[in-house]
Amino acid sequence: GKKDMEEVVAAAKNNQGMYGKKTILFIDEIHRFNKGQQDYLLPFVEDGTIILIGATTENPYFEVNGALLSRSSVFELCPLSQEEVETLILRAVQDEKKGMGSYHAVIEEDALHFLADLAGGDARSALNAVELGILTTPRSEDGMIHITLEVASKCIQKRVVRYDKTGDN
C-alpha cells in the first residue's frame, strides 16, 4: 500500500543523502499498482531517488502509467526454447543443492521432451510437473524414481493461454 511505498521512498532518500547511493526498487506485477500508486513513484523516478524496475505479464503500454513508461526502457522476455527448458529440467533433477537431486530421480528422454514441449517456454510449468512427478512416484527396485512418459503425462497442468487487450499473447 501507500504506507509501504512511503517507507521505501524514505529509505531511498536516506540512502541517497547519507551514502550517495541510489535505490533500485523492483516491483513484480507492477500492473497491479493503481494509477495513484504509480503516480506516487513518478517524482522519485524523475529525480533519480529510485531506479524502478517493474515486471508484468501484461502489456505495459496498457497497464503501466504512460509517464512512467516514457521514463523507462521496456524489455520483453521471450519464452525459453524447448532445448533451454530441457536443460533446466535436467539440471533440476540432478542438482542436489539447488534442485531435486537428493531424491535420486531420473527422467527418461521421451518424458523430458514431452514436458519441455508442453511447457511452451515456461520453465516454472515444466519444473512444477517434474517436481510433482518426483514427489508422487514410488521408487523402483533400483532405488531410483523413474520419470517416464506415463508419469510425465499425469503431472502436466493445463497451460493457460493468455491474451492481452489487443488479442495478442
Model-derived features: where do they sit?
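Short conserved motifs of the RecA-like P-loop NTPase core
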Residues: 22, 102-118, 149-154
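Conserved C-terminal helix/linker of AAA+ ATPases
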Residues: 130, 136-160
